[in-house]
Amino acid sequence: MFPVPANLQRLADQIDGWLDLRCPDRALALLAPMLADANGRAAGLVLRVRANVRLGEFAAALPDLAELRTLAPAEGWVDLTEAFCRKRLGDLPSAITCLEGMLARDIKSDIGHFNLGCYLALTGERDRAIDEVTLACGLNPECRDFARDDPDLDSLRNDARFRVLLRQAPADAAGNPGPLDDDEDDDDEPPPTGPRDHHRRN
């Protein structure tokens, strides 16, 4: 996502390891050299965001995400993670705005459509929510499995359109791909922070 200078790679790997071990406090304690290095700061900010998200310090992650946005305005990970943080802080309108902005740039992000559908469902916008989850399932059939279990979508479960969506196979009997699935490669990787809700397939 953001390059790590060679002289900081070992430290970055160590910090990443602590995050993988679910020890974000240990990761935070090691970040100062990366944040102080002009070439390593962006990668350091990503790691600090991941640590704060793991700790549940969602408000603390927002300034770092804002700085990352100035460095890489089109980076979808920033939008997805900010949306997650704002949702956890109870600001669903801002979370939805983040995802809408990301999808305006990358309409083929399955996780973007799926998470937007979840957030819309929580606000009571059922029709839009079903539309977004349908798009996500067309881009990535695995999203149908996530939709079956995701509590954010509970308000949709009595809707006939949603029930039909969950019963559909990813391809029809003739082997045609689902809607919007116009290539064979799935190049939409989930963010590395952990959320899906945030990130239901992380």
Regions found by a protein language model. Give the residues of each.
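Alpha-helical adaptor scaffolds
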Residues: A43-I111, C118-L122
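TPR/TPR-like (Sel1-like) alpha-helical repeat modules
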Residues: A121, R126-D145, R167-A173
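Alpha-helical segment of the N-proximal tetratricopeptide repeat
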Residues: V4-G56
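Structural marker of alpha-solenoid helical repeat scaffolds
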Residues: P3, D37, L71, R105-D106, ...
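"A position-specific structural signal for the A-helix of alpha-solenoid helical repeats
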Residues: D13, L47, T81, N115, ...
